[in-house]
A protein has these predicted regions:
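Intrinsic disorder in cytosolic terminal tails and internal cytosolic loops
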Residues: 146-153
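Structural signal for membrane-spanning alpha-helices in multi-pass inner-membrane proteins
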Residues: 36, 78, 104-109, 137-141
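Alpha-helical transmembrane segments of multi-pass membrane proteins
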Residues: 51-76
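Alpha-helical transmembrane segments of multipass membrane proteins
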Residues: 28, 32, 36, 66, ...
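Short membrane-interface helical motifs at transmembrane helix boundaries
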Residues: 31-53, 57
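Membrane-interface helix-loop junctions in multi-pass transport and translocation proteins
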Residues: 45, 87, 97-135, 145
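Residue-level recognition of transmembrane alpha-helices
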Residues: 25, 60-63, 67, 93-94, ...
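Small-residue-rich hydrophobic transmembrane alpha-helices
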Residues: 1-38, 72-84, 88-89
Length: 153
């Protein structure tokens, strides 16, 4: 929808597409968080967690915090692609899946290995990564709006 509006050079439709796309994404992710937080045992059963059930439930509760920001990041990526921002989309993807998460999980694991923190600290790498990527994504969105959307006649 946003790409179509961009092709039409319709600022209002682009802005509406971004606005409603993000609103729907946030609403859906909040529902996902609620379901995961309320019924983590059901997910453990789905994945046949067995003896690792408690670890699985703990991990799901921490990781579900990242759902909201992950959803926003995926929406940002779609917005960037629709507005000819493939590089920005790629950067967010790399931040989320490689550049932030791997070093952060490695650093967190050092604290766990040294006995300073529990195993759940490693799972916090997911929400922290998503929040950082979301902040970078917001900066990219402002830049794209300024340079591509607001310049439309």
């Amino acid at each position: 929808i946003i790409a179509f509006a961009y092709g039409m050079r319709s600022k209002k439709r682009i802005q509406d597409g971004i606005k409603y796309g993000l609103i729907y994404t946030v609403a859906l992710m909040i529902i996902g968080i609620a379901i995961t937080e309320i019924f983590p045992g059901a997910f453990a059963t789905l994945f046949n967690a067995g003896q690792s059930r408690e670890y699985f439930i703990g991990a799901m509760r921490v990781i579900s915090v990242s759902f909201l920001f992950a959803g926003i990041n995926v929406a940002y990526q779609g917005i960037y692609q629709a507005l000819d921002g493939g590089v920005e989309s790629l950067v967010i993807s790399l931040l989320r899946q490689l550049i932030i998460i791997l070093p952060l999980a490695g650093i967190f694991s050092l604290f766990v290995r040294n006995g300073q923190m529990g195993i759940s600290l490693i799972w916090w790498a997911f929400p922290v990564t998503e929040v950082i990527a979301c902040l970078v994504g917001y900066v990219f969105l402002k830049k794209i709006r300024k340079n591509r959307v607001n310049t439309l006649i």
